[in-house]
Amino acid sequence: MLDKIKHIILVLSGKGGVGKSTVSTQLALTLAESGHKVGLLDIDLCGPSVPFLLGLEGHDVHQCEQGWVPVFSGADQRLAVMSIGFLLKNRDEAVIWRGPKKTAMIKQFLEDVAWDELDYLVIDTPPGTSDEHITVMECLKGVNADGAIIVTTPQEMALEDVRKEVTFCKKTGIAILGIVENMSGFVCPNCAECTKIFSSGGGVALAELAQVPHLGTLPIDPRVGALAGTGKACVTELPDCTTSLVLKSIAKSIGAE
């Protein structure tokens, strides 16, 4: 099912709560707004947030001869989405599975979803380096995945976990497309001034240390946060904000025009 996909991008984070799913979702929307056919696969089995972020909660998936049919976001149906969140009754339902069952589900997501022809598939992964990540890497061995984007925050604790993520990528042979530093500063909703409320520059320093590109720095912007649950792209709703400019730059770095 992956052989018809031109580009496969993984989005990783060493720690939870760094905004990885938001970056994944907005990157997928940015690519779709650029005219590309895009798939977004959420394999965070225990904490699927993509359906909520795109305003797709309550949608059901069904099967065809080729496998599961993804849920489409937007009237133009340029963004196809698959998540375990579509298979759960509600957001409060917990996924309490052992490793083998998680592995089997991820393999199904990667092998049995009828994506059809896509320009890009963005894979939103769970935090850390667990069985789920190893399964993804094994399933992608037969295809030419572009590589991984690693999301971090400026705090030292998050950066420590990202160092492990960098090591994981190198050991499993997945290329690192770059590092994104998220939640670096707070944008005032009244005057748009960005104040450094945490430390900053950690993502840049880590990228230099790991000898990989630094793809950009994203602030905490309440206007961007308000888009959660709407399915709207930041690049169209807030075209001049820092987040939009960084997203466009990332899209360009992975070949999107």
Swiss-Prot record:
Q: How is the cofactor bound?
A: Binds 4 [4Fe-4S] clusters per heterotetramer. Contains two stable clusters in the N-termini of NUBP1 and two labile, bridging clusters between subunits of the NUBP1-NUBP2 heterotetramer.
Function of the molecule: Component of the cytosolic iron-sulfur (Fe/S) protein assembly (CIA) machinery. Required for maturation of extramitochondrial Fe-S proteins. The NUBP1-NUBP2 heterotetramer forms a Fe-S scaffold complex, mediating the de novo assembly of an Fe-S cluster and its transfer to target apoproteins.
Going by the entry's taxonomy, the superkingdom of the source organism is recorded as Eukaryota
* Annotated organism of origin: Culex quinquefasciatus (Southern house mosquito)
Fetch the InterPro entries from UniProt. Mrp-like_CS, Mrp/NBP35_ATP-bd, NUBP2/Cfd1_eukaryotes, P-loop_NTPase, YlxH/NBP35
The cross-references to HAMAP family, in alphabetical order and at most eight, read:
Mrp_NBP35, NUBP2
The Gene Ontology biological process terms listed for this entry are: iron-sulfur cluster assembly
What does the record note on quaternary structure? Answer: Heterotetramer of 2 NUBP1 and 2 NUBP2 chains.
What this protein is called in its record is: Cytosolic Fe-S cluster assembly factor NUBP2 homolog
Gene3D superfamilies listed in its UniProt record: P-loop containing nucleotide triphosphate hydrolases (3.40.50.300)
Q: Kindly list the places in or outside the cell where this protein is found, as annotated in its UniProt entry.
A: Cytoplasm
> What CDD domains does the record point to?
Mrp_NBP35
Where would you find the membrane-spanning parts of this chain? none
Which residues are recorded as binding [4Fe-4S] cluster?
188, 191
